[in-house]
């Protein structure tokens, strides 16, 4: 009997010990760790914009990707910066009308976390591009709305573009791609030349899943927040970064099949822009180790622990993209020579909260350099492009 009576006491003691341990860990995390959530995908972003909404079910365009905002404008924090979102789900305080204002040139950007920005609002690529183009515009007003989100890929951009250009009046579309954006992704196109959105229904997120009650606690707990974001970071690396790195270390041949899968999407993009009389440009952001040997060593030692293949370092993926763009009738801007010419390449990239130089996300200077190159291209007449291969949106 005495033994049975001791179990409640033991359980109470164990519970008290666990609670004390949790509280001590919570205090330690708050004192010694800077918990600054970083968005890894649009589900993460949605949770911060409007936690009560679910962007798997509802967003401005009714698509399986994108944002839903329940208020006209919302704010969230991302890698230390306040991010404001308009009613369209863009990281932008301006609520753009679908119709373009008079005497205005509107350049729409599509991209992932690089376009979304790891910098202050005024330092982002859309803002820098607007300033750079206004210097060349002879008084014409410039608008640069941008649909962007951490975790998006080339398929995401095309889905958003199909809907966006049917609603927004635009003059130019710039699609900014990173090497991992086109690794293994193929745009599904129907027989009538449209993107098959229904086939892209979102799969359940494999990152840390919490009940509503635990989420309510986690929202106020630095410890649980840190654990949740560590889980998301691990999953994001396993799902997207490591497969891309495997190709980067194997050589150019590892990208060939993936680049070939883009052809249908590139053809669809070229035809859509041509039919709507929109100028379209694909722009590729390089990985830092491609730019300079000394910087490559610094980045690789900090992040990867492995060396990129010579083909990748020598711009093999970018050359493959340029060839595909020419084949399908798209303008293409390779930022590798732009960044090399800018010099001091380490300053082109964002410094992470952990004190490491990012290998792809741009600093304020990086965005300014990119914007100047892009504005120069867009201010010049379109380059002559082949048209024979762009008659259909289907592959």
Listing of model-derived features with the role each one plays in the protein:
Residues 2-20:
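N-terminal Sec-pathway targeting helices
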Residues 13, 24, 29, 262, ...:
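Histidine-centered active-site loop/cap adjacent to the catalytic His
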Residues 22-38:
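Membrane-interface motif at the C-terminal end of an N-terminal transmembrane signal
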Residues 26, 112, 157, 173, ...:
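Generic structural signal for small/hydrophobic residues in well-ordered secondary structure
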Residues 37-132, 136-139, 339-354, 395:
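Membrane/wall-proximal cationic-aromatic binding patches
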Residues 77-84, 100-101, 106-108, 114-209, ...:
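Conserved SGNH/GDSL esterase-like catalytic core that processes O-acyl groups on lipids
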Residues 113-119, 146-147, 255-259, 308-311, ...:
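Second-shell loop/turn segments in exported
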Residues 178-323, 330, 335-345, 386-391, ...:
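Serine-dependent acyl-ester chemistry module
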């Amino acid at each position: 009997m005495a033994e049975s009576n001791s179990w409640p006491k033991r359980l109470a003691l164990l519970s008290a010990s666990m609670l004390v341990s949790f509280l001590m860990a919570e205090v330690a995390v708050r004192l010694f760790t800077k918990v600054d959530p970083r968005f890894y995908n649009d589900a993460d972003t949605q949770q911060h914009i409007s936690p009560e909404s679910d962007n798997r079910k509802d967003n401005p365009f009714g698509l399986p990707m994108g944002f839903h905002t329940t208020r006209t404008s919302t704010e969230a924090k991302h890698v230390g910066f306040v991010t404001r979102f308009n009613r369209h789900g863009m990281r932008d305080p301006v609520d753009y009308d679908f119709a373009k204002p008079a005497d205005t040139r509107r350049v729409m950007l599509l991209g992932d976390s690089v376009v979304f920005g790891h910098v202050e609002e005024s330092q982002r690529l859309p803002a820098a591009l607007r300033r750079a183009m206004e210097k060349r515009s002879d008084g014409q007003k410039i608008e640069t709305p941008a649909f962007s989100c951490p975790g998006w890929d080339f398929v995401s951009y095309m889905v958003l573009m199909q809907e966006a250009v049917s609603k927004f009046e635009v003059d130019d579309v710039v699609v900014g791609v990173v090497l991992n954006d086109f690794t293994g992704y193929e745009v599904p196109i129907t027989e009538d030349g449209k993107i098959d959105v229904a086939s892209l229904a979102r799969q359940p997120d494999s990152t840390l899943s919490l009940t509503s009650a635990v989420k309510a606690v986690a929202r106020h707990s630095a410890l649980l927040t840190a654990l949740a974001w560590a889980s998301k970071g691990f999953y994001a690396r396993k799902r997207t970064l490591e497969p891309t790195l495997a190709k980067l270390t194997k050589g150019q041949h590892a990208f060939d099949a993936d680049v070939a899968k883009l052809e249908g999407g590139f053809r669809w993009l070229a035809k859509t822009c041509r039919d709507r009389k929109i100028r379209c440009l694909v722009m590729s952001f390089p990985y830092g180790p491609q730019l300079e040997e000394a910087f490559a060593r610094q980045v690789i030692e900090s992040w990867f622990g492995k060396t990129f293949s010579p083909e990748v370092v020598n711009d093999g993926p970018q050359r493959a993209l340029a060839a595909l763009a020419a084949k399908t009738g798209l303008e293409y801007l390779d930022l590798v020579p732009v960044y090399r010419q800018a010099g001091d390449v380490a300053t082109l990239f964002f410094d992470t909260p952990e004190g490491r130089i990012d290998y792809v996300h741009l600093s304020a200077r990086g965005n300014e350099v990119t914007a100047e190159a892009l504005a120069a291209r867009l201010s010049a007449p379109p380059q002559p492009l082949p048209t024979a291969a762009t008659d259909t949106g289907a592959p």
